[in-house]
Amino acid sequence: FLGLGTEPYAYFKQASKTLTDRPWRLIHADLHRGNIMVDHHKKLWFIDWELGLYGDLLLCIAAHIHRTRYYERERKMLIEDIKQGLPEAFLKNFDKDLEFYLNFEAMKSVITDTYRFPEIFKEERFSAKKEAELCMYYSDNLNKIAPLIGCKTTTPDEALRWFQEWG
C-alpha cells in the first residue's frame, strides 16, 4: 500500500557502504526524555539499556534527535554542542552520516508505526492534539524517506484516515 516494496531497506543497505569508519562505542540507541533521569544531586542517569549495543555514536545521536523531536532551532544548537564536545575522530563526515542515520530512524518508525498506530488508535482515546501529533510524526517520517525509496507521501489528515481505516 505504501510502496515500500519487498526490500524496504535496500536503499539503506547500499547507502551504509559510504558511512565513515569511526571509533565504535557502547551506545544506548534509545535516548529520549523518558530514558534520561536527573537525581537529587543534579547528576544525569540513562535508564532502559535494552537496546544498547556497540556501534557508531552517530546512530545514538540520531536516535535521540529522532525520538525527542526537537524544534529545528534546538536541533541545530544541540548538534553544534555535540560537535564541540566530540574528539576529532568522530567529526569526519559528521553531517552526512548523521543524515543517513536520521533517515534510517525515520524508516524504522514508518515500518513500526504503520502497524502500531492503527492498533493504538483503535484501543485508546486520544485528544485531538495527540492524534494530530502522532499523524504529523508519521507523515513527516514517511515524507522524509519517500525521495530515498520511492514510497508514497502523505498528509497528517490522510494518515489519520488510514489509521482509522486500518484499525
Where are these regions (language model features)?
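Activation of the activation-loop gatekeeper triad in protein kinase-fold domains
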Residues: 41, 48-53
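All-alpha amphipathic helical-bundle segments outside canonical DNA-binding/catalytic cores
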Residues: 91-105, 129-133
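ATP/Mg2+ or Mg2+-diphosphate-binding catalytic cores
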Residues: 112-167
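Conserved catalytic-loop position in the HRD/HxD motif
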Residues: 25, 30, 35, 48
